[in-house]
C-alpha cells in the first residue's frame, strides 16, 4: 500500500516540500471548517474488535451490520478504482477502513483522497470481512481530527537511526511496534512489582527528591539552589536514609518506586536519571532480602513473558531455578582458577592485576576494595545466570551491618544477571555509634579526593539513636530489570526520553 495514487505524490518530494504541501492542505481545511475538531467519540479499539469478531466468518458477520466508531493514525492507504482502503492505528493495534461512494458522498471521498499518512482520523461504520477475510470497517462517515504536517518514516525502513529514535520518541512509538511493546511491558513490570510488594504487606511511600545532604549511596550528585532558603540542595542519589527513618518511626515495611539522579557518565547501562525500587523490612535481614529480590524478578518475568526462562541477546537466562550465591573471592576463583589465596590477599599483586584487567584503582587502598575492583574486572561480566555476590567488605559498605562471624565483612549482597548488577541489599547497620564512625571514615575519603564518598548525616544518626530495629533493605534497578525482561541491549531503549547531548 502506498500514497502513489494521491493527487500529488509526496515520495517524489523532499521533507521540506512535503511539509510545505501539507501546510497548504491545512490552510485550505481551515478555510472550510474547524481543522482540529474535538467532538468525535470513539467507542471501539482495534484489538478489541479483532478479539471479538476476528474469528467470525464473513457469512455470519456481514449481515449483522455491527456499528462501530474507531479513531487512530492513518498508516496505510490505497485506492482501487472508486473505492479506497486505509489502515488506522490506535494504541491497541490496527484496523482497516473501506470507503466507496455508496457509503459516503463523493465530496467526502475527494477529501479523504487528499489526506496523508500520519493524519489522525475518526471513522464510523459497520464491520464486515473482505474476500481475503480481513476484518474491516465499511465507512459511513469519516473526519480528519488532526493533520500531520510531517511525514512518517518509510514503512519498510522504519525509524532506523538510533539517535532519532531517542530524541524523537514520539515518532519511534508511531513507527515501531517493538518500541511500543517494550514500554507497555515496562508499565506491566512496574505494576507487577508494586502488586507483589503490596501482597507482602509493604506500604508504598514517597520521600524527598531534593536532599540537604546527599546520601544513601556512593555517587556524585546533581546540585541546585533553593532561593528562598538560600541553601544548596541535591537531587537524590538514593532514598535509603529517608526510608530507614520511616522504619525508625514504626512503618515496618516500606517501599518506594521512583527516580534517583547521579551526575556521572552515560553508557548502555547508565542514565543520569533512573528508576529504582527500594524496600525495607523491620525484623529482617539480607537473607530475606535476597529471597524477596529473587521472587520479585521471577514474578515480573512470569507477568510479561509467561515464563522465567527467557532469552537475552540470543542466550538463555534461567530465572526459574534458585539463584546461585558466591562470595567475591569465590566468584574471582570460579573464572580464574589459577589465582591463589596468597595472591588475592597481596595488595601489590591485586593492584597490578586490576590494571591488567582495565579497571581503575579504587580510592580506598584496603584489601577488600582491591578484591572488589578485581572482581569487577575479571568476573562480574561473566555472571550470566542470576548470581548473588555476598559478604562485601566493610570499607565499601558504609551502611551495611557487619557480619557477626566473618571479620571485616558485612551482610551485604549484590545481584548480577547477564553480566551486570541488578540489585543491591543488606542487613542494615542499626548501631548509631558504628554508623557515625563509618560516616567519619567516608568524610575522610572525601577529603582525600573521593568525590563519591558519603557526607556525614547528623539527622540520620539522630534518628538511629531513637532505635532502628534489625532491618533488611534492598534496591532493584527498574530500568535494568526492564532491559532484561524485554531483551533490550541499552538502557536508552527502555527509558522513554533518555538524556542526550544537545542537538
Curated annotation (Swiss-Prot):
Binding site for Mg(2+) 1: 414, 421
GO molecular function per UniProt: ATP binding; lysine-tRNA ligase activity; magnesium ion binding; tRNA binding
Cofactor note text: Binds 3 Mg(2+) ions per subunit.
Family matches, as InterPro entries: Aa-tRNA-synt_II, aa-tRNA-synth_II, aa-tRNA-synth_II/BPL/LPL, Lys-tRNA-ligase_II, Lys-tRNA-ligase_II_N, Lys-tRNA-synth_II_C, NA-bd_OB-fold, NA-bd_OB_tRNA
Compartments reported by the entry: Cytoplasm
Binding annotation for Mg(2+) 2: 421
EC category name: ligase
Catalytic activity reported: tRNA(Lys) + L-lysine + ATP = L-lysyl-tRNA(Lys) + AMP + diphosphate
A Pfam family recorded for this sequence: tRNA_anti-codon
Cofactor: Mg(2+)
Keywords for this protein: Aminoacyl-tRNA synthetase, ATP-binding, Cytoplasm, Ligase, Magnesium, Metal-binding, Nucleotide-binding, Protein biosynthesis
GO CC terms, sorted: cytosol
Principal localisation: cytoplasm
SUPFAM superfamilies associated with the record: Class II aaRS and biotin synthetases, Nucleic acid-binding proteins
Coiled coil: none
PROSITE patterns (alphabetical): AA_TRNA_LIGASE_II
GO biological processes: lysyl-tRNA aminoacylation
Catalytic activity, EC: 6.1.1.6
Annotated family: Belongs to the class-II aminoacyl-tRNA synthetase family.
Oligomeric and partner information: Homodimer.
NCBIfam families (UniProt xref): lysS_bact, PRK00484.1
Listed name of the protein: Lysine--tRNA ligase
Organism: Neisseria meningitidis serogroup A / serotype 4A (strain DSM 15465 / Z2491)
Organism classification: Bacteria, Pseudomonadati, Pseudomonadota, Betaproteobacteria, Neisseriales
Amino acid at each position: 500500500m502506498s500514497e502513489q495514487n494521491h493527487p500529488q505524490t509526496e515520495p517524489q518530494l523532499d521533507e521540506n516540500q512535503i511539509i510545505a504541501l501539507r501546510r497548504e492542505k491545512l490552510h485550505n481545511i481551515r478555510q472550510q471548517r474547524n481543522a482540529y475538531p474535538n467532538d468525535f467519540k470513539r467507542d471501539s479499539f482495534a484489538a478489541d474488535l479483532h478479539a471479538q469478531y476476528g474469528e467470525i466468518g464473513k457469512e455470519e458477520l456481514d449481515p449483522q451490520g455491527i456499528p462501530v466508531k474507531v479513531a487512530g493514525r492513518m498508516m496505510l492507504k490505497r485506492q482501487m478504482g472508486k473505492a479506497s482502503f486505509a489502515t488506522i492505528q490506535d494504541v491497541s493495534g490496527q484496523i482497516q477502513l473501506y470507503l466507496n461512494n455508496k457509503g459516503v458522498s463523493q465530496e467526502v471521498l475527494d477529501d479523504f483522497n487528499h489526506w496523508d499518512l500520519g493524519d489522525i482520523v475518526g471513522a464510523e461504520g459497520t464491520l464486515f470481512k473482505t474476500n481475503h477475510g480481513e476484518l474491516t470497517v465499511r465507512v459511513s462517515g469519516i473526519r480528519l481530527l488532526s493533520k500531520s504536517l510531517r511525514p512518517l518514516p518509510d514503512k519498510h525502513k522504519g525509524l532506523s537511526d538510533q539517535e532519532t529514535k531517542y530524541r524523537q520518541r514520539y515518532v519511534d512509538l508511531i513507527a515501531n511496534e517493538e518500541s511500543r511493546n517494550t514500554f507497555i511491558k515496562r508499565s506491566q513490570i512496574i505494576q507487577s512489582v508494586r502488586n507483589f510488594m503490596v501482597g507482602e504487606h509493604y506500604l508504598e511511600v514517597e520521600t524527598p527528591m531534593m536532599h540537604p545532604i546527599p546520601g544513601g549511596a556512593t555517587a556524585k550528585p546533581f546540585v541546585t539552589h533553593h532561593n528562598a532558603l538560600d541553601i544548596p540542595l541535591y537531587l537524590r542519589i538514593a532514598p535509603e536514609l529517608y526510608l530507614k527513618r520511616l522504619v525508625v518511626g514504626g512503618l515496618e515495611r516500606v517501599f518506594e518506586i521512583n527516580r534517583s539522579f547521579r551526575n556521572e557518565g552515560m553508557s548502555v547501562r547508565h542514565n543520569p536519571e533512573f528508576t529504582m525500587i527500594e524496600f525495607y523490612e523491620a525484623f529482617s535481614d539480607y537473607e530475606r532480602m535476597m529471597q524477596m529480590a529473587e521472587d520479585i524478578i521471577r514474578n515480573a518475568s512470569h507477568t510479561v513473558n509467561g515464563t522465567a526462562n527467557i532469552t537475552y541477546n540470543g542466550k538463555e537466562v534461567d530465572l526459574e531455578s534458585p539463584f546461585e550465591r558466591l562470595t567475591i573471592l569465590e566468584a574471582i576463583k570460579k573464572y580464574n582458577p589459577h589465582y591463589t589465596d596468597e595472591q588475592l590477599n597481596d595488595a601489590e599483586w591485586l593492584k597490578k592485576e586490576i590494571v591488567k584487567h582495565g579497571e581503575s584503582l579504587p580510592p580506598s587502598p584496603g584489601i577488600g576494595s582491591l578484591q572488589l575492583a578485581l572482581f569487577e574486572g575479571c568476573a562480574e561480566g561473566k555472571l550470566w545466570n542470576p548470581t548473588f555476590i555476598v559478604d562485601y567488605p566493610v570499607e565499601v559498605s558504609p551502611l551495611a551491618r557487619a557480619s557477626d562471624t566473618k571479620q571485616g565483612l558485612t551482610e551485604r549482597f549484590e545481584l548480577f544477571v547477564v553480566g551486570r548488577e541488578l540489585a543491591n541489599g543488606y542487613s542494615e547497620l542499626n548501631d548509631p555509634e558504628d554508623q557515625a564512625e563509618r560516616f567519619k571514615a567516608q568524610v575522610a575519603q572525601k577529603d582525600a579526593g573521593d568525590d563519591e564518598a558519603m557526607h556525614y548525616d547528623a539527622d540520620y544518626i539522630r534518628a538511629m539513636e531513637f532505635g532502628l530495629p534489625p532491618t533488611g533493605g534492598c534496591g532493584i534497578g527498574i530500568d535494568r530489570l526492564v532491559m532484561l525482561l524485554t531483551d533490550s541491549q541499552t538502557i536508552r531503549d527502555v527509558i522513554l526520553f533518555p538524556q542526550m547531548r544537545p542537538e
